[in-house]
Amino acid sequence: MPRDPNTLSNYNNWRTKHTIADLAIDFKKQRVHGTVTLQLESITDKESEEIILDTSFVDVQKIAVDGSKTEEWVLKERNEPYGSPLSVKIPGGAAKGTIIALDITISTTDKCTALQWLTPAQTSNKKFPYMFSQCQAIHNRSIFPCQDTPDVKSTYDFRIRSPLPVLASGLPRGAASFVHGENGESGTLLYSFYQEIPMPSYLFALSSGDIATASIGSRSLVSTGPEELLGAKWELERDTEKFIETIEKIVYPYEWTQYNVLVLPPSFPYGGMENPVFTFATPTIISGDRENVDVIAHELAHSWSGNLVSNASWEHFWLNEGWTVYLERRIIAAVHGEAYRDFSSIIGWKALEDSVKLFGEDHEFTKLVVDLKGKDPDDAFSSVPYEKGFHFLYYLERLVGKPTWDKFIPHYFTTWKKKSLDSYEFKATLLDFFASDEAASKALESVDWDSWFYKPGLPPKPEFDTSLVDKCYALAKKWESKDFVPSPSDIEGWSANQVVVFLQQVQLFTTPLTPSQSQAMGKAYSLVDTQNVELSSRYFGVGLAAKDESVYLPTAELLGKVGRMKFVRTLYRKLLVVDRKLAEETFEKNKDFYHPICREQVEKDLKE
């Protein structure tokens, strides 16, 4: 049995080694079409006479095996939530190690879950259409048939024809072969990219639109809409190279040549997506104050944890995200000081508590290692793998001591480089590495692996250094009194994240603020019209809990401007409680603005 339950492919019999995506982007029909070539290696000796690939809502038109057209293929019945397996017969099988090339001619359909198409009206300058992909966790199969599992890694060639600039998760080779458009349509160029480091299918990425580019460092570019370019450049140019150099000292040198950032339109559903060469990022990080660039530290860290060393299935997602949060906080500590690591961890602990509360403390999805048989990995997405995963690694670091632990980090990322692993292999690698270190081995004997892996709910809470949050807590305490009169000087000199911690504390009050208190807070601390969504969204949360009607419409307005699920889902849930009608109307009005992944999750939330 393959160890990934979320794929229908028979990847234990055949392995994708190289993928050529020769595709055209059709903005008018909102389709991607063309030919994808999969070079698959036979893992058995003639035992398997069919290749089974994942597909979901893809229109498969024709298939060739080693250059010869075949009719011996069938798209089988849909198996929710995984799609329709595509079976291609290989009569007589193939000797072990033989490479078989499948050329599959496809078109995406309007049910494709990986692509979002924006009309010109949905973009900022309203001049051109835009498209982008989001393949994690199991959405690449809705663009083209593939072995859609993180347990398989392939090198890639991208040849993408589009009337607008294209970016992909490979190194750019440039644009060539202009073709004139017909009937007054725009002409197209062929944009080529290559990826020589094998990567899992969920890191396949495409974007095309009115995209301009500027340098933000010696090996980094930022790409975004022309109007936003200078703001994005300013936001990122101070820290990007510094972050790269910092993490290179913790792990080992950056392997992907360039580290670039594409700032997407506002409907992008995540904070960032660690697509190799081009991190896809939410525009909410461009807040004009450089306060949210930690998202870049996180996505950059994925270049090691997740992209070079990958979880073998989504049941072990903590190996991607826990490690990435751990490395992100190590970058922050090195750049800003150790207290900032704890400060970030305190914010993360609150997010973990929120997730556990939302699922329920006995829920399967609050475990570190989850059972996803028959389940959609998107449904399990929460801060649990991020924060519980971080806490496990932080616990291990404290157990063996930081200088000792720091020797393990490059060893782990070297051992599993360009491979995928599960939690049991992580455990074996760790114990094996420290076997010759008597003190560390002794310390590791106390680890209750079963509880960490399989016990639902919160892990043990460590003692944090609270020096940076104490004043946030102290100010929140003052707000417990109905007589407190706020002043802008209360938060003078604070970072945005300190205001976030203060607002989180206020959200924990057993008795919410009164509407007049909520309004006074918004006014004194300039929280209504801030460009920083981390602040406005949390302030609206406080106001909604206070039943302060003055924030209802601004909340609905924000929900029409931001598509990042972290903000969207939380605000809809809170708006539902106080004004279901407004929540439903706001969703109806904006549902075409949201990404399909976000739209589906909010629809589920509204039904609950």
Swiss-Prot record:
GO terms for molecular function: aminopeptidase activity; epoxide hydrolase activity; metallopeptidase activity; zinc ion binding. Binds 1 zinc ion per subunit. Its EC number is 3.4.11.-, 3.3.2.10. Pfam families: Leuk-A4-hydro_C, Peptidase_M1, Peptidase_M1_N. Its cofactor is Zn(2+). GO terms for cellular component: cytosol; fungal-type vacuole lumen; multivesicular body; nucleus; NVT complex. Zn(2+) binds at H298, H302, E321. Substrate binds at Q134, C135, Q136, P269, Y270, G271, G272, M273, E274. The keyword Cytoplasm applies. Keywords: Cytoplasm, Hydrolase, Metal-binding, Metalloprotease, Nucleus, Protease, Zinc. Its main location: cytoplasm. SMART domains: Leuk-A4-hydro_C (SM01263). The active site is at E299 (proton acceptor), Y386 (proton donor). It is found in: Cytoplasm; Nucleus. It comes from the Eukaryota. InterPro entries: Aminopeptidase_N-like_N, Aminopeptidase_N-like_N_sf, ARM-type_fold, LTA4H, LTA4H_cat, M1_LTA-4_hydro/amino_C_sf, M1_LTA4H, Peptidase_M1. It catalyses: an epoxide + H2O = an ethanediol. GO terms for biological process: cytoplasm to vacuole targeting by the NVT pathway; lipid metabolic process; peptide catabolic process; protein catabolic process; proteolysis. Coiled coil: none annotated. Belongs to the peptidase M1 family. Aminopeptidase that preferentially cleaves di- and tripeptides. Also has low epoxide hydrolase activity (in vitro). Can hydrolyze the epoxide leukotriene LTA(4) but it forms preferentially 5,6-dihydroxy-7,9,11,14-eicosatetraenoic acid rather than the cytokine leukotriene B(4) as the product compared to the homologous mammalian enzyme (in vitro). This is Leucine aminopeptidase 2. It comes from Sclerotinia sclerotiorum (strain ATCC 18683 / 1980 / Ss-1) (White mold).
